[in-house]
């Protein structure tokens, strides 16, 4: 069982604004599509459902963006140790670039889906936008409504079974990175 103080691990304003802007620029060059929900053992194919999730996504490539994979892997390792989760992590999915325009959101959900190579155990969100560029769009945990994350460059790592959401954006555009780290099923 998780202690409440270890529900997540955070680095506030860790990624410099110039790097956040470069990631946004690179992200906008990716193949951007409507975000899907689902995609687990019972539902092999994800589906677009704007009543649950309304955002656009693209995925970084391990060949052209290897530095990003390595950077995020390092933060995951530190969080896994510092928060004392010590989860068995064996792999990393491609980082997802996410765009939330006006009225876009992602309702409460868990990331802990199963895949052929294992299950998602740790999730990471990196806030790329300057908070003055958008209104709404707060990243929040279901059991931690007092914790609101909006600062540019903030990295949040948490167990993938923790429910969380992105509130609707009411003005502007919010950009973020999401990454998942996998391992064998919990025992």
Regions found by a protein language model. Name each.
Residues 1-155, 161-187:
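Fe(II)/2-oxoglutarate oxygenase catalytic core
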